[in-house]
Amino acid sequence: MANVKLFDQTGKEAGEVVLNDAVFGIEPNESVVFDVIISQRASLRQGTHAVKNRSAVSGGGRKPWRQKGTGRARQGSIRSPQWRGGGIVFGPTPRSYAYKLPRKVRRLALKSVYSEKVAENKFVAVDSLSFTAPKTAEFAKVLAALSIDTKVLVILEEGNEFAALSARNLPNVKVATATTASVLDIVNSDKLLVTQAAISKIEEVLA
């Protein structure tokens, strides 16, 4: 079992947290992490690209000249693909790039990136993040007290609305819950700031 220091939101040590090795202490599987990141990035693509084929281009309903007798090549429409201003052949159409990986693969990737952050001492555990109202300045003080000045992913327990609202407007800060934190978010952050309740939830889901 790995132990990490537990801090309060004033930056003082409040003990230790014992992490479940089945979640936070495995050998990271880089291949699986790569596959999941590619999948998540594909899901973020809009896929709204579109061009007009010959049936979608306006005009071109009349045959431009008669079939025979002009000496020119026969043509049926000025919107045929070989014409300037004509339709595009096999062009891109709106589509979804999303695809799903097996649940076991996604869970292994999450455990891999969590374990990597713990091994690199980039995992900061805090007993709680409680605010009486959404206050961005107050959350900035918490980060300063914990000496966090890089890109950070804040992982909260469900229902901690004030903390989420306090953090989301800060630069280089992204907020997620224990069940919504993605592999892509974790890899893109320099540090993780995780509440004790969120750690328990992560272990419950992934162990």
Swiss-Prot record:
Ribonucleoprotein in keyword set: yes
GO CC annotations, alphabetized: ribonucleoprotein complex; ribosome
GO MF, any single term: structural constituent of ribosome
GO biological process: translation
Pfam families assigned: Ribosomal_L4
Keywords per UniProt: Ribonucleoprotein, Ribosomal protein, RNA-binding, rRNA-binding
Keyword rRNA-binding part of the UniProt annotation: yes
HAMAP family, A to Z: Ribosomal_uL4_B
Record function comment: One of the primary rRNA binding proteins, this protein initially binds near the 5'-end of the 23S rRNA. It is important during the early stages of 50S assembly. It makes multiple contacts with different domains of the 23S rRNA in the assembled 50S subunit and ribosome.
Complex formation: Part of the 50S ribosomal subunit.
Protein name (record): Large ribosomal subunit protein uL4
Organism listed in the record: Streptococcus sanguinis (strain SK36)
Gene name linked to the record: rplD
